[in-house]
């Protein structure tokens, strides 16, 4: 089931929306769905309604994207749980998770110490973010985070609840003499972030390359990406004191979906790259060692 609002932007029409109509290679057809228990518990699941290609609501009012498709696979595979889908803004997701309105939130979240203290989280990655610096094609001075700092380049502001903010914040802590100008901002879609770089308003953005690969040609932005800044595990966030059996059941399915290639297929479908084939991907784990 799905509760949310209709979302339709021009950038998600035409060829991009054709992607959401493709059948998944694994785990998505009715024949593979398990029969639900008569006592299956309903889980309130929430995704971001406007975060292509991670999750969004298409012109037919369907939740889709990497997170949307993965949650549908999980819902079909879980015997003792059934998902009720919600799609809202990122801020509303966090509020609803904090108040207990939602049990599980999916928005390619990175795990931070603050999030681990405030919420429960999956013990297995739901995906991998290949984080890059996104710059204009004619920008030849930015190749890494150090170039942002030494060149006093303008970085697109980042929402403080986004772990990309923490990545830059941690860099600044380790380099007190060479700081990146980090500014907070409200919610922005990937398209808006990339447009801010393409227009020259900012020099660079830090963002998963999958979103750039999915949007660059469609929006004719003439952007390119640096080498990888790092591979980061994505996690589900759960409301505090969530039934540990639910988390355990979903973690077990995530392991199985990685093993059978479903996660790699979703990555190719939505990010235009198989993040699981990247060097170091096999070593990406959910880490709670904050030191």
Q: What are the language-model segments listed below?
A:
Residues 34-109, 186, 250, 260:
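Extracytoplasmic small-molecule ligand-binding "clamshell" domains
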Residues 49-52, 60-76, 132-179, 183-189, ...:
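Bilobed "Venus flytrap"/periplasmic-binding protein-like clamshell domains
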Residues 84-95, 143, 180-195, 231-232:
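Short helix-initiation/N-cap motifs at beta->coil->alpha
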């Amino acid at each position: 089931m799905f509760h949310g609002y209709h979302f339709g932007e021009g950038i998600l029409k035409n060829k991009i929306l054709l992607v959401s109509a493709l059948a998944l290679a694994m785990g998505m057809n009715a024949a593979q769905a398990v029969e639900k228990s008569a006592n299956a518990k309903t889980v309130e699941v929430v995704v971001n309604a406007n975060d292509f290609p991670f999750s969004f609501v298409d012109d037919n009012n369907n939740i889709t994207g990497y997170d949307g498709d993965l949650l549908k696979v999980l819902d079909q595979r879980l015997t003792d749980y059934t998902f009720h889908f919600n799609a809202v803004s990122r801020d509303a997701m966090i509020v609803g998770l904090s108040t207990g309105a939602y049990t599980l939130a999916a928005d390619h979240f990175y795990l931070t110490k603050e999030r681990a203290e405030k919420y429960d989280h999956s013990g297995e990655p739901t995906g991998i973010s290949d984080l890059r610096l996104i710059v204009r094609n004619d920008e030849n001075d930015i190749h890494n985070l150090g170039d942002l700092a030494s060149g006093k380049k303008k970085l697109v502001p980042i929402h403080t609840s986004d772990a990309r903010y923490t990545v830059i914040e941690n860099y600044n802590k380790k380099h007190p003499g060479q700081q990146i100008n980090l500014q907070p901002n409200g919610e922005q879609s990937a398209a808006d972030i990339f447009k801010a770089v393409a227009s020259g308003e900012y020099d660079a953005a830090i963002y998963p390359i999958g979103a750039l690969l999915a949007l660059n040609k469609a929006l004719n932005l003439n952007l390119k990406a640096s080498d990888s800044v790092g591979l980061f595990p994505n996690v589900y966030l759960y409301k505090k004191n969530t039934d540990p059996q639910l988390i355990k059941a979903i973690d077990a399915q995530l392991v199985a979906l990685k093993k059978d290639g479903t996660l790699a297929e979703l990555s190719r479908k939505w990010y235009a790259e198989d993040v699981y084939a990247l060097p170091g991907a096999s070593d990406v784990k959910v880490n709670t060692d904050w030191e």
